[in-house]
Amino acid sequence: MNFLLMASFAEVMNYVLYVLIAVLVLLVMITVHELGHYLTGKIFDFAIEEFAIGFGPKIFKKTKKNGEVFSVRVFPLGGFCSFRGEDKEDGDPRAFNNKKPWQRIIVLVSGALMNYLFAIFIICLMFGIYGTSALMTYEVSGENPSGIILTDENSFKNRDVILKANGKDVYIITDLMNAVNGKKLGDTVDFTVIRNGEKRDMSIVMLADADLKNVEDVNGLCNVLGIKVEKDEEDNVVSNGFRSTGVRRGFFTTIGCSFNYSFKLAGTIFTVIGQLFHGEIGIKSLGGTFTTISVTAGVIKTGGWWSLLNIASFIGVNLAVFNLLPIP
């Protein structure tokens, strides 16, 4: 009994650690965002009142000679950079409301730009350490209700690394969805994969009609490609046989892939927003701060440092996109 209690306590403490790391990731991204506002404000000589990390009561405060306040607050899930004249009229020529419109616009968008550039930096770091992002068929289903005869040349095997689909690079699972969506049972799609260390081109046969309704339809994608899916008692997908992996490339190719990957992440976010407005997915799919923390903690728990850097880059791009949208 004591052993079981100790094991349970260890699991709880491990999860708490993952949650704390997730909170730290989110805090860093928010701080980077506010730092973008702060730095451009300094460049254009805006009167800055306070730069705060977190929100709520102050636990640390330092006032500079020019009157700027730097503070750390008790709740590490936010932050802000406040400018004089931001909310009310002020006679100071350095006040926000007295600056030129183009300067104010640059200051306003600089937070999102900083998030995006920082996300690209993280992606470059991740790709430099682990290789550029690709998808691996970690586990195929082994089931074939279609009746199509499968061979080594027209179907995936365990641990195939997918590089391209229809001639386009595959970084994330939505790339696969775009490549196969609309295909019918028995159609083929051209793939470039690494199998047993050897790069090869293959024509993979579709094992079902690929009528993928939205970015959440991973179950449909797995059925089409013969990849294993695990579901809970309510028929919700809890895991699938795809895993992210890294592929070593040259320096400049890695840099180019980093930018391309950031565009893919941004495109996925815009796709989700579009599907949300068309009613194809629910508002719950977006989640919130606590959902972000929970998902991040789960990803870190199962995927290690690669997944930590990957989810951090996604959060950075996500913050960049949503802060540029005309949403109050």
Outline where the language-model segments fall:
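Short, flexible surface segments
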Residues: N66, L77, N158-V161, L185
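PDZ-domain C-terminal substructure recognizer with occasional recognition of PDZ-binding tails
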Residues: L163-K164, N178-E234
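Conserved PDZ fold ligand-binding element
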Residues: P145-T174
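Residue-level signature of transmembrane alpha-helical entry/exit and packing/kink sites
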Residues: N14, Y18-A22, K100-L108, N115, ...
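Functional transmembrane alpha-helices
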Residues: N2-M13, K99, S141-I148, D209-V321
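Internal alpha-helical transmembrane segments
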Residues: V32, I43, E50, F70, ...
